[in-house]
Amino acid sequence: MLIQINTDKNIEGHSRMNEFFSEEIKKELARFDDKITRIEVHLGDENGDKFGKHDKKCMIEARMEKKNPIAVTAHSDTPEKAFYEAVEKIKRSLSTTLEKMREH
């Protein structure tokens, strides 16, 4: 599973943060490891320099072989909170998608 972490110009994306988020993705999505080919994480601040509640956004896209990508988005006060909310959403979406695949 290839993991890509992307940030916009308003979120400082240093290597320690990228490593941390990559490890969290690996840990949280381990049970889907054989199904997922790539995960993309996009972190951003929708208000830029201005302060706003829930203006940090995390979009996670999971790509599976021969399937359409699954994408989820979460907003929160901090990039970390948005990330964890998006991880929970993508886990639920992947579980639902794989359950439907098994039923057919």
Per-range role (PLM):
Residues 1-104:
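N-terminal, polar/charged subdomain of small-to-medium soluble alpha/beta proteins
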